[in-house]
C-alpha cells in the first residue's frame, strides 16, 4: 500500500510539471458560451480562470431558441462552452453542430448528464439501452476503503500529536471555552453522529442566531480560529472519527441536519451523497472552495462516488496538500 502511495506521489509530481508546461505553452484561442441567462455572468467569470483564459469567452448566447444565427456565431470560435440551464433539445443541437464542425466542446453537467456517465450498453432485442450506475459501493470497495482509512489515520494521529497539542494550548490561551467542539452531522445512510473539530469560533457562537454558515470575515471566528481554519488544522480531530468508523479520510463533507433538510428540499438528489461515509476531504474540497454552491459541490460528490477507488482516494489526499496553501479555498460564503 505504501509503495503504491509513493508511486502515486511521483506520478502526481510528474503530472504537475506537465500541467505547468502545458499552461505556459498553451496556444491562443477563443470561445463562445451557450447558456441560460441566470448562469451567464458566473460561468463567464469561472471559465475565464481556467489556464488563465481571462479573455477566452468572446461571445455569450443566452438562448438559441428563435436565434437563427447561432451557428454562424459559433463558426468564428475554436471552443464551445455549454451551460447547465439550457434545455436538452438546445444542447443536442449545439453538440451535433460542434461535432460536425470539429469543435472542442465543454459542458457543465446536470444530474441527468451525471447519471449517463460510465453507463454500460444493454441490447433489448434491437433497442439500445444504457444501464445507469447505482451510486453504491461494492463490498470489496468498502473493505479496501476501510483498510486505507485505518492505515492512514493511525500514523497521521501519531505524527500530528505534537501539532494538536500546540493547537490545544493556543486555543486555551486565545479564548474561553472547550478546545474540542463537537457538532451533530449527517453521515452514511442518513445517520447522525458527532463530528470533532478544534474550536475556531467564540463559545456559543450560534446560541442566538441558530445554525448559520460561516461568512467571509465572520466576527464569530477567533484569532487562533482564523489560522487553524485557513490551514485546516481545525479538522484534525476528525481523524478520530475516521478511526471510529464514522467517517472516511476521503468522501463528501458531512453537513448539519438543519442544512441537509434545506438542501434535500431544494435538490432531492442531495441525499445520494449519504450512500458513502463522509470524509475529512473530498473531490468537492480540492476542486471547489468553501463558498462553492451546494449544487456544484453535490456534482463533485456524485462524480467521486462513481469514480471511487484506492487510487482516487490517494490522489485526492495529495491534491488536498496543495489546496491547504490556497487561502481562497477557506473563505466563507458572502
Predicted regions mapped to residue ranges:
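Short, glycine-rich, amphipathic interfacial segments at transmembrane boundaries or analogous
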Residues: 112-113, 119, 181-220, 281-299
Amino acid at each position: 500500500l505504501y509503495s503504491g502511495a509513493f508511486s502515486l506521489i511521483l506520478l502526481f509530481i510528474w503530472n504537475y510539471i506537465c500541467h505547468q508546461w502545458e499552461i505556459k505553452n498553451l496556444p491562443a484561442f477563443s470561445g463562445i458560451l451557450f447558456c441560460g441567462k441566470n448562469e451567464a455572468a458566473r460561468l463567464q467569470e469561472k471559465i475565464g480562470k481556467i489556464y488563465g483564459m481571462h479573455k477566452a469567452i468572446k461571445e455569450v448566447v443566452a438562448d438559441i431558441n428563435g436565434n437563427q444565427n447561432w451557428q454562424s456565431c459559433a463558426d468564428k470560435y475554436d471552443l464551445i462552452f455549454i451551460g447547465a440551464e439550457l434545455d436538452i433539445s438546445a444542447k443536442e443541437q449545439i453538440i451535433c453542430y460542434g461535432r460536425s464542425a470539429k469543435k472542442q466542446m465543454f459542458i457543465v453537467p446536470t444530474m441527468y448528464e451525471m447519471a449517463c456517465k460510465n453507463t454500460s450498453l444493454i441490447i433489448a432485442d434491437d433497442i439500445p439501452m444504457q444501464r445507469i450506475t447505482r451510486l453504491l459501493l461494492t463490498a470489496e470497495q468498502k473493505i479496501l476503503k476501510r483498510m486505507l482509512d485505518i492505515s492512514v489515520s493511525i500514523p497521521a494521529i501519531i505524527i500530528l500529536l505534537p501539532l494538536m497539542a500546540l493547537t490545544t494550548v493556543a486555543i486555551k490561551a486565545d479564548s474561553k471555552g472547550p478546545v474540542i467542539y463537537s457538532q451533530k452531522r449527517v453521515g452514511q445512510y442518513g445517520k447522525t453522529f458527532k463530528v470533532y473539530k478544534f474550536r475556531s469560533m467564540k463559545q456559543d457562537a450560534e446560541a442566538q442566531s441558530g445554525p448559520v454558515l460561516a461568512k467571509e470575515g465572520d466576527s464569530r471566528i477567533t484569532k487562533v480560529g482564523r489560522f487553524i481554519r485557513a490551514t485546516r488544522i481545525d479538522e484534525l480531530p476528525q481523524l478520530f472519527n475516521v478511526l471510529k468508523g464514522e467517517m472516511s479520510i476521503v468522501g463528501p463533507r458531512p453537513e448539519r441536519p438543519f442544512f441537509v433538510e434545506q438542501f434535500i428540499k431544494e435538490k432531492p438528489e442531495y441525499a445520494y451523497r449519504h450512500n458513502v461515509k463522509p470524509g475529512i476531504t473530498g473531490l468537492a474540497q480540492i476542486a471547489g472552495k468553501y463558498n462553492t454552491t451546494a449544487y456544484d459541490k453535490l456534482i463533485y460528490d456524485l462524480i467521486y462516488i462513481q469514480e471511487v477507488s484506492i487510487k482516487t482516494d490517494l490522489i485526492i489526499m495529495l491534491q488536498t496538500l496543495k489546496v491547504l496553501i490556497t487561502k481562497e479555498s477557506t473563505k466563507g460564503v458572502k
